[in-house]
């Protein structure tokens, strides 16, 4: 396989096992570089395997049905892989204070569903960076953390 195909296989496994319907935290040790950067607009940046595992553990405790899935084929060029996705979940778990725009009290029952595009950089077979551009405004509005846009 080419470098790009190898990198797409790594990212495909990451999306399925880390962001999919169930989370296998062991995939962090298998695929993430020791100092991997995970950065999305809704949350503070995470650095390193332990920080990334702690983030996902808290996210899935607050949103037990959390899952994301690919919305298009992965695109690869050199060390980079780009994926378009959608997903979300229902806040039925404990209070969640990881959003940059506020805290959810325990079990609000609010649902979020949103989309995004993620760029991942692969270095020597490990994910060095995952930087996502997401529709965080939609998610925060659905969760009641910011006002919904007025409709005409």
Give the residues covered by each predicted segment.
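C-terminal and inter-domain tail/linker signature
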Residues: 1-152
């Amino acid at each position: 396989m080419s470098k790009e195909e190898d990198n797409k296989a790594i990212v495909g496994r990451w999306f399925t096992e880390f962001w999919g319907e169930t989370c296998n935290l062991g995939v962090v040790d298998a695929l993430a570089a020791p100092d991997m950067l995970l950065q999305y607009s809704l949350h503070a940046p995470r650095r390193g395997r332990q920080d990334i595992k702690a983030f996902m553990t808290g996210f899935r405790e607050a949103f037990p049905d959390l899952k994301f899935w690919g919305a298009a084929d992965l695109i690869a060029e050199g060390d980079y892989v780009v994926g378009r996705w959608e997903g979300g979940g229902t806040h039925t778990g404990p209070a969640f204070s990881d959003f940059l725009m506020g805290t959810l009290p325990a079990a609000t029952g609010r649902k979020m569903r949103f989309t995004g595009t993620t760029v991942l950089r692969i270095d020597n077979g490990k994910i060095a960076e995952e930087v996502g551009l997401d529709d965080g405004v939609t998610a925060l509005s659905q969760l009641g953390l910011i006002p919904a846009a007025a409709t005409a």
